[in-house]
Amino acid sequence: APQEPVYPGDDATPEQMAKYAAELRRYINRLTRPRY
């Protein structure tokens, strides 16, 4: 199973938050992709 990205924290930089958001979207896409 894909690793869940780690939340960088409330004091994270905008760059860290953007990276986390992108990784989280990829993670969710992997989880919800149908298994054919």
Swiss-Prot record:
Matches recorded under Gene3D superfamilies: 6.10.250.900
Domain of life: Eukaryota
Compartments reported by the entry: Secreted
One Gene Ontology term of the molecular function aspect: neuropeptide hormone activity
Biological process, per Gene Ontology: feeding behavior; neuropeptide signaling pathway
GO CC terms in record: extracellular space
InterPro entries associated with the record: Pancreatic_hormone-like (IPR001955), Pancreatic_hormone-like_CS (IPR020392)
A Pfam family per the record: Hormone_3
Main location: secreted
SMART domains: PAH
Keywords, in A-Z order: Amidation, Hormone, Secreted
Protein purpose: Hormone secreted by pancreatic cells that acts as a regulator of pancreatic and gastrointestinal functions probably by signaling through the G protein-coupled receptor NPY4R2.
Protein name (record): Pancreatic polypeptide
Gene name tied to this protein: PPY
